[in-house]
């Protein structure tokens, strides 16, 4: 079972693809986009996508507080469970953040999985991606590679450390911004 917290254009794209292969539980503040709640997702799903906004602060830095709040909630609940949860971060976060979170949230295996979507074509972009980057530690990245291989059999899946994956996201965004 797969959980997805956040059903904006990224979370919805993940849902549209994964629902064809797994039972998928979704949660969003907009109840019309949810088929579950956060607690049910945490208890039932060993693999949880976090697709939440990380808006820019006034100083230009990335505001990761929404994601951290959700990770804290997941960590508090999973601390009492027998199995750890693989948390797949889709939100844009500064390099080094996933590594910091893996030290802070000991009951979670946090992996950064950058998205390269356009808002107008998010579902199509996600369904037709040719590369998937999983940034984190083993065994989480190995388990997730198996899951992603089933859903994206033709995509090239790259396992790396989380900081490199976060840098790839930032560098790609920078490159795309120069093309505007």
Regions of interest found by a model, annotated:
Residues 55-121:
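Rossmann-like NAD(P)(H) cofactor-binding subdomain of soluble oxidoreductases
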Residues 44-45, 84, 129:
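Local beta-strand N-terminus motif with an aromatic residue
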Residues 53-58, 164-166:
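A short, flexible beta-alpha/helix-coil linker loop
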Residues 102-111, 122-180:
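Internal alpha-helical scaffold of NAD(P)-dependent oxidoreductase catalytic cores
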Residues 50-53, 91, 136:
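Glycine-rich, N-terminal phosphate-binding loop of Rossmann-like dinucleotide-binding domains
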């Amino acid at each position: 079972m797969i959980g997805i917290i956040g059903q904006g254009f990224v979370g919805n794209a993940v849902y549209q693809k994964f629902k064809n292969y797994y039972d998928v539980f979704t949660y969003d503040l907009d109840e019309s986009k949810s088929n579950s709640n956060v607690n049910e997702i945490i208890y039932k799903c060993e693999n949880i996508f976090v697709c939440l906004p990380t808006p820019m602060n006034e100083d230009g830095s990335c505001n990761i507080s929404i994601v951290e709040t959700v990770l804290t909630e997941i960590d508090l609940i999973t601390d009492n469970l027998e199995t750890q949860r693989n948390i797949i971060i889709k939100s844009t976060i500064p390099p080094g953040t996933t590594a910091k979170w893996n030290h802070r949230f000991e009951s979670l295996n946090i992996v950064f999985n950058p998205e390269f979507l356009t808002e107008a074509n998010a579902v199509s972009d996600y369904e037709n991606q040719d590369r998937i980057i999983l940034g984190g530690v083993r065994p989480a990245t190995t388990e997730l590679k198996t899951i992603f291989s089933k859903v994206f059999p033709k995509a090239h899946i790259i396992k790396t450390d989380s900081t490199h994956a976060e840098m790839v996201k930032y560098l790609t965004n920078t490159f795309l911004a120069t093309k505007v």
